Structures are given as C-alpha cells and as structure tokens.
C-alpha cells in the first residue's frame, strides 16, 4: 500500500517509478480521489464540530432564558443530526475508494533494480558450483521417480486431479529429510524462530501481504457457514482488550451479524507461509529493540496456478500443492537492505551444503513480484530438464519496504517514542519440492538410483541410496 502523502508531495517521482514498472501515470487520478476524500472528511468533521458547539450554545441560551435562540439552535442541531449520517457515509466511501485504488498498485522498485519488461531483463548476480559431467544422459525426475515406483502422478490424479503427486518410500523420506535439514540450519544457525502457523487464513491476512485483491484467481478459497455460537466465540476473542486497540474495533459491526442464523465466512489456503508469518505482526506496535524479528516455517502451500495452463505439465515443477520452507524478517527501515542480503545468503547456504549448482539473478522491474522493491531469485541447475538441463527458480528473496506494513498496520516505536511502519522481507529457504527435484536429477546414477547427499544422511535412517523398492 502506498502513502498518499508521499504521492501528494512528489507525484512526478511516483509516476516515474510506475513507468519503470511498465505502468501508466496514476498520480493525477489518485490525487483527484484524494481531494474529494479530504473534502468529504472535512465536511463531516466540520458538521460534527458545529453540532458540538451548537449543543453547548443551547445550554447557554437556556441559561440566559433566550428561548428563541435556544429553539433556533435546537433546530440546527436536529438538521445536522439528520444530515450527518449521509456525510459520514460519503466520507467513508471516499476513503474506501482511495484505499481500493492504492491497493491495486504494485510496490515501487529501488533505484538499483535493473529496468526491464520480463525475465530477459534479469541480471546474473553470481554463480555457485559447476554443472556436473555424466557418463550417461541424465533423466528428468518424473522418469526417475516413476521407474523407482516412488513418484505416482496417476494415483494423485485419481485423488485430486492434475498437478498433484503421491510420493512413497525413499522419495517421501528424502523430501521430509530436505525440509527438516533446511529448518535445522535456519533455526540452529541462522537465528530464525520456527513457527507452525495455520494453513487457513482470512481475507485481511491475504490483503496484508498483497495476495488480495489482485491475485485472488491464483488462490484456493472456500466459504464456510458460521453458526451464531461460532460467530459469538470469534467476537469474544476479538473483544479481548489485549487484542484490541482504540479505533480498531466497532462493536456494532461485530454484534449486528449475530442476528442472522448463519454467516458466510471465506478462508484461504495459504499460497506461501509468508502470509501467516508476516501477519504475525499485523496491527502491532513493536519495540525497535526487539527487531529484527526472523520467522521460518515448513508448510504445505497451495496455488491454483491460474496463469500456468500448458506450462510444466509433466513432473513436480509446478504443483497445486507443494512444500516450502519460508523465511520472513521484520526490520527497521535503516536495516532492511542489509537484511535482504543476509536472507539471500541464508537461502544459498542450504543449497551449498547440498552441493547443488545454482545462479542468483537480480530481477528487473518487469519481473518482480507485486509487493517487492527488489528481488533476488536463486535458480538451481536441474540436469534432467529440457534438452541438456535448465536453471529453474527454487527461491525468491524480496525486500518490500513498508508496502506490506501499511496494509497490515504494523509499526514499531523507536527511541523518540514515535511509531513508524516496519519493513518486511520474505524469501524461500527454499522450495522443498524443487529441491527434491534438483537432488534427484543431480545425484542420479547410471542404474537409475539416487545417491543421498552427505548432509541428508542423518535424516535418512541409514539409507544411502534410493533404489527401486527401498
């Protein structure tokens, strides 16, 4: 979410940044909405102020026994009382119109981000390792897994449809080992706090990290009818004063729906643990002495992949359900850039220990995510992909500035005592399913078996090679 005051102060800079994103200028239309919003709010505030003043004057007139003046003032108050709800509604509608318009606009790129229109404008930052030489033609993971009998797409299709997989025996254990290894490194060495978050979240959480409203079609959601008792339970939780700050709770809004026998609530399956982890600080004022906060989670993730029709239809590269280790940092504005570099190095470290060849790309303005100011992609080498192998994304590490914090109302208080918005960062540390693919294709042997990387041996119960039936 953008700061309308910043747009007001420098509309040309805002439009110039949007141009780098490939978007038309928007400052004029936003400022026009803002002007109407401010006028509506001012009119509402002036009406309230006049009503308060007139009410006080009524008492003074009656005290002075000026009945005519008292009657005139009472008529004025009655008229204001009649017109004010409409004025308040107009102010609220104008505010919501601006909020909706701002919510549709992506974050602005940092100055050092390269300009470009798509992935062809990305710049290679650095490379780790080298491509391995094989005395045979490397096979893709789906062929390896199928021959082992441990990767079953047909059974998954019967259960759930396309873009799902059933893993068994050695491959199921190998995927579990990879995820556990990633978590152990990030929590034990990199200082991240492990979190086991809900996999279902509400609209506000998805809005906070900017999956909504723009990317609703890429998500899985469902509607649940909540009974009166369920609604009451939720209302009681939200009334708890430890969770409610002044100005953030509308009793009428909470109680009115209870008159209905049921209410439809929508929940979303998380597309990434970034959503619950980042929203842990929503509607909070943190002590800056506690920052940075670093969270990590190993979770299933769910994506509809609405725009991926026809792409990566074979194998596990693009699934509706996949496992990922997520890294999230909450920082001050002064430290977010350094934290971004640190997060990248943490994601790289687990791949280095697996001895996987990869490259790091700095994404251009046309290829960055909606909420990102700057993104590094880690692309791991998969020797069985395409003709002769291919680099495939296994991690994206992004710094978002205060873009998500404004949507979540997440702030911190520094030495001067004034609250300000925190900066948020997120990255994959890394995608476990794609790491499994990279390990399978990199460590495959001529007989179709897969050697287990040394760092994963402690997690494999003595299994050193995954072969058919093991």
Swiss-Prot record:
Pathway: Aminoacyl-tRNA biosynthesis; selenocysteinyl-tRNA(Sec) biosynthesis; L-seryl-tRNA(Sec) from L-serine and tRNA(Sec): step 1/1
PROSITE patterns: AA_TRNA_LIGASE_II (PS50862)
Predominant place of localization: cytoplasm
GO cellular component, one term: cytoplasm
GO-annotated molecular function: ATP binding; serine-tRNA ligase activity
Keywords of the record: Aminoacyl-tRNA synthetase, ATP-binding, Cytoplasm, Ligase, Nucleotide-binding, Protein biosynthesis
EC number: 6.1.1.11
InterPro entries for the chain: aa-tRNA-synt_IIb, aa-tRNA-synth_II, aa-tRNA-synth_II/BPL/LPL, Ser-tRNA-ligase_type_1, Ser-tRNA-synth_1_N, SerRS_1_N_sf, SerRS_core, tRNA-bd_arm
Binding site for ATP: 303-305, 393-396
PANTHER family: SERINE--TRNA LIGASE, SERYL-TRNA SYNTHETASE
HAMAP family with a match to the protein in the record: Ser_tRNA_synth_type1
Quaternary data: Homodimer. The tRNA molecule binds across the dimer.
Protein name per the record: Serine--tRNA ligase
Name of the coding gene: serS
